[in-house]
Amino acid sequence: MVKRVAIVGAGVSGLASIKCCLEEGLEPTCFERSSDLGGLWRFTEHVEEGRASLYKSVVSNSSREMSCYPDFPFPEDYPNFVPNSLFLEYLKLYSTQFNLQRCIYFNTKVCSITKRPDFAVSGQWEVVTVTNGKQNSAIFDAVMVCTGFLTNPHLPLDSFPGILTFKGEYFHSRQYKHPDIFKDKRVLVVGMGNSGTDIAVEASHLAKKVFLSTTGGAWVISRVFDSGYPWDMIFMTRFQNMLRNLLPTPIVSWLISKKMNSWFNHVNYGVAPEDRTQLREPVLNDELPGRIITGKVFIKPSIKEVKENSVVFNNTPKEEPIDIIVFATGYTFAFPFLDESVVKVEDGQASLYKYIFPAHLPKPTLAVIGLIKPLGSMVPTGETQARWVVQVLKGATTLPPPSVMMEEVNERKKNKHSGFGLCYCKALQTDYITYIDDLLTSINAKPDLRAMLLTDPRLALSIFFGPCTPYHFRLTGPGKWEGARKAILTQWDRTVKVTKTRTIQESPSSFETLLKLFSFLALLIAVFLIFL
């Protein structure tokens, strides 16, 4: 029986894994190579080897209500989008609340994780670590790898002819910390993901000129969405997810395009995605269109050639003088402490069932947590993965035969990546909620909306039509949280409370009352059609 579990990494997913093990009676031991917990969210002035790095101004792209642990809401005085320093504070509050730090060995590097000679029977692993120069070895019944995928920068210099002749400065976005280096410089940022766009916008406040080069474009949305609410609380609902899955792709694409262009016309600003037939990960930035329209940021196509002090873009013969190039070209991932026979990474993909279990292992005692890029927050995603894994380790739920798991893995691999970043699976980008529900179903933790509609209709309607907040995931099943119902029904109150710092007297409107009545009737009709 699985008892002792090794956990690699004390970031968002590592902390969740420790807690999930503890609440099910397992004995977790977490190895963290740095001096403190927090992973990505712990800002340092210098880049640390083997640890994700962020810049000083990073703010969460998922809102507070959508990116908390399912049974541990953010403090109510936190802003709706959380700066990195407060996010780290939240993780420490989580660790303290559930007494997780007692399970963590800091300044400890995992050197190797290998199968024991009797692995086919025992499923055990030997974990070799180094702490302050001293090597240690221990045997564990299972391993949960929580190292993330933002530590190995992807810098494809051979894709940029002439880069080695460039006399200016160039570096990967992982190295970026502060915008001061751009003062009075001509800056080129390559790659229009979240980091690339953030850096270009920050640079535009100090630089002489800023170019943002993109190959495929992107949908750009603001954190502030309909009526001023957080974007994901409006966009990520079970009702909308159902529509996106049921409606024909051309209709979904048209609806998404119309919604994305309601802020600004992406074609007119030169940022529209080349492929608009699927919902790719949007770029979250509140300033970009304003910087473009005021001539502070110039959108450019891919690079044709780099010269000593300038760059030539495709389809634009003019040379643009450049002093600094920032490559926001994504990351690759690897597991240097694992043999390739355990987890093999090819073309930016690993053969992991549900992005978690190596499909070929005879014993499912090694799991990778957080190696996924859903269109939603990593915090509840990683926590749900960890919760599912612990149930598998306990034997409370079982995996399909290896052949079935490999079939799913191979089907996923057909989604080839483009651009410079990770291979983001189309299904998971579109169906974040579906992915979470799939894991919850296998541990009997998915909310039963049909039954709930009869016993608690207010909650059922809130779950179906309202934002898919993480509290849904701990409403039932093993490890359910008694505060989940209240958290769901009060989520909008908390969202408004933190912004409504000046009270304004609102006059009642009979029209609004009538509109609400008709809206309620429409909801009842929709529920009737969907559930009956």
From Swiss-Prot:
Protein topology in the membrane: Single-pass membrane protein
Biological processes annotated in GO: energy homeostasis; negative regulation of fatty acid oxidation; response to lipopolysaccharide; taurine biosynthetic process; toxin metabolic process; xenobiotic metabolic process
Gene3D superfamilies: FAD/NAD(P)-binding domain
Catalytic activity: hypotaurine + NADPH + O2 + H(+) = taurine + NADP(+) + H2O; hypotaurine + NADH + O2 + H(+) = taurine + NAD(+) + H2O; trimethylamine + NADPH + O2 = trimethylamine N-oxide + NADP(+) + H2O; N,N-dimethylaniline + NADPH + O2 + H(+) = N,N-dimethylaniline N-oxide + NADP(+) + H2O
Ranges annotated as spanning the membrane: 511-531
Binding site for FAD: G9, A10, G11, V12, S13, E32, L40, W41, N61, S62
Obligatory cofactor(s): FAD
Tissue-specificity statement: Liver.
Listed SUPFAM superfamilies: FAD/NAD(P)-binding domain
Enzyme class per UniProt: oxidoreductase
GO terms, molecular function: flavin adenine dinucleotide binding; hypotaurine monooxygenase activity; monooxygenase activity; N,N-dimethylaniline monooxygenase activity; NADP binding; trimethylamine monooxygenase activity
UniProt keyword terms in alphabetical order: Endoplasmic reticulum, FAD, Flavoprotein, Membrane, Monooxygenase, NADP, Oxidoreductase, Transmembrane, Transmembrane helix
Segments in the Lumenal topological domain: 1-510
Subcellular localization, as worded in the UniProt entry: Endoplasmic reticulum membrane
Binding-site positions, NADP(+): S60, N61, S195, G196, T197, D198
PANTHER family to which the protein is assigned, alphabetical: DIMETHYLANILINE MONOOXYGENASE (PTHR23023)
Function: Broad spectrum monooxygenase that catalyzes the oxygenation of a wide variety of nitrogen- and sulfur-containing compounds including xenobiotics. Catalyzes the S-oxygenation of hypotaurine to produce taurine, an organic osmolyte involved in cell volume regulation as well as a variety of cytoprotective and developmental processes.
Name of the protein in its database record: Flavin-containing monooxygenase 1
Protein encoded by which gene: Fmo1
